[in-house]
Amino acid sequence: MTKYALVGDVGGTNARLALCDIASGEISQAKTYSGLDYPSLEAVIRVYLEEHKVEVKDGCIAIACPITGDWVAMTNHTWAFSIAEMKKNLGFSHLEIINDFTAVSMAIPMLKKEHLIQFGGAEPVEGKPIAVYGAGTGLGVAHLVHVDKRWVSLPGEGGHVDFAPNSEEEAIILEILRAEIGHVSAERVLSGPGLVNLYRAIVKADNRLPENLKPKDITERALADSCTDCRRALSLFCVIMGRFGGNLALNLGTFGGVFIAGGIVPRFLEFFKASGFRAAFEDKGRFKEYVHDIPVYLIVHDNAGLLGSGAHLRQTLGHIL
């Protein structure tokens, strides 16, 4: 067996590749490539392997799209490929293609305390189910359970469940967005584009015309307190994040913790801490006490997707995490 495996974390914009020490799980030599610069994922992998001059026979790539069979077509990119064909072309003995939040969930057992920031709740209960979700280009969701000394990730497309408002303001947001786009999923409000949707709906609810803002613009104006609409949008984003996380906690009794990943929340960490997130997380009526002690953590590891891809592959190859 070779010392290293190839691991990857591929989103709608970038492909991040690295080497994973098969024995220890340590990630090294990570490099990010723009997806727009390459015709295929295989082309990116070939460039990476050529640059690093290392023999690799095993690989695991996490991708931001559903993985339901051999054919993979990315949701937010034009890349599409056959897993079996790419494995053959690269000369790999083993190639795993997994959902990006499967990878993030598999990273959780590998994380240390310094990789986490806690938002309320008590200590996690060992051996109990775990939920992980995160907003970025879209909204990713997965669960993690421990069975027979193995970690089992339960991937899905939970980001596309219905947006479920629980206040008058949220109901108005739903009404406006439904008139524009039809079905309003949670991802339509909990993502970068979702933050824009919240801003636009807030402005339109007041019979005004919204500006053509990007997620970055809304966040910057909200933090600078220079735009009331942007601040309202960001505050509402935090509240809906809390409601959604609380729903995940109820679904599977995640007393092992609820973990937040994705690139959006760390950009306004202090704002998030002071927001209505935790109150919304616990706002479950008769089941408020049920979720009260469930801890929520923000993952602040720079390469959680790569770490989890490596963990998934190592476990598949017979290692105990």
UniProtKB/Swiss-Prot annotation:
One Pfam entry name: Glucokinase
Any one of the GO BP annotations: glycolytic process
Gene3D superfamilies referenced in this protein's UniProt entry, alphabetically: 3.30.420.40, 3.40.367.20
GO molecular function: ATP binding; D-glucose binding; glucokinase activity
Keywords assigned by UniProt, alphabetized: ATP-binding, Cytoplasm, Glycolysis, Kinase, Nucleotide-binding, Transferase
Catalyzed chemical reaction(s): D-glucose + ATP = D-glucose 6-phosphate + ADP + H(+)
List of residues binding ATP: 8-13
Chief location category: cytoplasm
EC code: 2.7.1.2
InterPro entries: ATPase_NBD (IPR043129), Bacterial_glucokinase (IPR050201), Glucokinase (IPR003836)
Cellular compartments per GO CC: cytosol
Localization of this protein: Cytoplasm
Family in the record: Belongs to the bacterial glucokinase family.
Protein name: Glucokinase
